[in-house]
């Protein structure tokens, strides 16, 4: 019960930091634009939903490893990640280019 409560609280913390990034920072949503941001070395942190296809996930993780960028696996599915971003569509992966006022890059562990 305690672990579940702690996981829920950290999940809410990620969501609030992500909402701050959406308001004040720069980001790219989607598989193709995430790969483009990794190839151009603009991405600082990558978030991948839990139900992202394994081939896409491994390709994003490979490009992130080459660019030395942290990858965080979001605990929710793509609908949850889209809702956390404040969008009305599904988001399987996103790249944070500029965190803005948020401290999400410092607080999230890179490889989880």
Swiss-Prot record:
<dbReference type="GO" id="GO:0022625">
    <property type="term" value="C:cytosolic large ribosomal subunit"/>
</dbReference>
<dbReference type="InterPro" id="IPR039109">
    <property type="entry name" value="Ribosomal_eL30-like"/>
</dbReference>
<dbReference type="Pfam" id="PF01248">
    <property type="entry name" value="Ribosomal_L7Ae"/>
</dbReference>
<comment type="similarity">
    <text>Belongs to the eukaryotic ribosomal protein eL30 family.</text>
</comment>
<dbReference type="InterPro" id="IPR000231">
    <property type="entry name" value="Ribosomal_eL30"/>
</dbReference>
<dbReference type="GO" id="GO:0005886">
    <property type="term" value="C:plasma membrane"/>
</dbReference>
<keyword id="KW-0689">Ribosomal protein</keyword>
<dbReference type="InterPro" id="IPR004038">
    <property type="entry name" value="Ribosomal_eL8/eL30/eS12/Gad45"/>
</dbReference>
<dbReference type="GO" id="GO:0003729">
    <property type="term" value="F:mRNA binding"/>
</dbReference>
<dbReference type="GO" id="GO:0003735">
    <property type="term" value="F:structural constituent of ribosome"/>
</dbReference>
<dbReference type="GO" id="GO:0005829">
    <property type="term" value="C:cytosol"/>
</dbReference>
<dbReference type="GO" id="GO:0009506">
    <property type="term" value="C:plasmodesma"/>
</dbReference>
<protein>
    <recommendedName>
        <fullName>Large ribosomal subunit protein eL30x</fullName>
    </recommendedName>
</protein>
<dbReference type="GO" id="GO:0009620">
    <property type="term" value="P:response to fungus"/>
</dbReference>
<keyword id="KW-0687">Ribonucleoprotein</keyword>
<dbReference type="InterPro" id="IPR029064">
    <property type="entry name" value="Ribosomal_eL30-like_sf"/>
</dbReference>
<dbReference type="InterPro" id="IPR022991">
    <property type="entry name" value="Ribosomal_eL30_CS"/>
</dbReference>
<dbReference type="GO" id="GO:0022626">
    <property type="term" value="C:cytosolic ribosome"/>
</dbReference>
